[in-house]
Amino acid sequence: MKTMLCAAAAIGALTAASAAQAQTAGDWTGAYIGGVAGYGWQAENDGDESIVFDTNLDGTYGDTVRTGTGADAFAAGFCDGQTFNPTRAGGCGGDEGGPEFGVRMGYDWQFGNIVAGVLGEAVRTDVKDSVTAFSGTPAAYTMRRDLNGLLAARARVGYAVGNTLPYVTGGYAWADMDRSFSTTNTANTFTQVSESKKWTDGWQLGAGVEHKITNDVSLGLEYLYTRLDDDGYTVRASGGPAGGPFTSVNGAGTDFNRTNDEFNIHSVRMAATYRF
C-alpha cells in the first residue's frame, strides 16, 4: 500500500503541475509506438508463505512429515526467501527485484477531453520469489520462481489537460516463468513433477501520466501492479535410508508444494512514445 501511495503521489504531482498551466486539450487520437524502462519487485504480501507436503501422494497437501520418533521433521520452520545455509539461524535472503525494459504500441481515440485507447506491451524483467523450509537433519529446501518476461494487453482511459494526459490502465498479462528447487539434503533424491518452465497469466492495474514534448513525442511515468496465478509447482522427495521421513508413509516418496500460487509485482517505469 505504501508503494502504491508513493507512486500515486508522484503521478498526481505531475498531473497537478500540468493542470495549473490551463492549456487546451491537444490531439491524442492516433497510433503510437514506444519504449519503457524501470524497476520491478515482489510485493511484500507473502511473508506467511511456507511449503506444504503430501506424504501419502493422494493429491492433498497439509500432511506432517514425521521422523522415526514421530516428531515433526520440519519443526524448524520456514522463511520467505532463499538461503544456502542448512539451518534457519543462518538467515534467509529476501525476494529480489530487478530492471524492466520493453516496447509497446497502441492506439488512442479522443472525445473532447476524454482519451481512451488500447495497447500491447512486451517487457523483459527479472523478479524472483522464493520460500524455504528447514528440516531438523539439518537441511534447507528452497522453491523459487523467476519472472523473465511479461506480455500485456491493456486498455487505458485518461483526461487530457493540454499536452498532458493522466490516465488509469488495466488488462490481461502473460508471463514467462522459470520454477526451480534446491536443497542442502544429499541423502534423498528430488524430482520435479511439474514443468520447470511455463507461461502463466493474470492481470495488471495501474496509473500514469504522459506529457507531449513535441507534437509527436511524449514522455511518461507509470505505476503498474501485476498479479499472476502460478498453478503450482511440485517436487517429489524419494529414496534415502529405509523408513526415512519422506518414504515412511508411501514408499514412492513425499510431494512438496508452496502455499501461495500468487506472484504479485510492483513496477515503476518511464516511457518514451512516438505518435504517428
Name these PLM-found stretches.
Residues 2-276:
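Gram-negative outer-membrane beta-barrel domains
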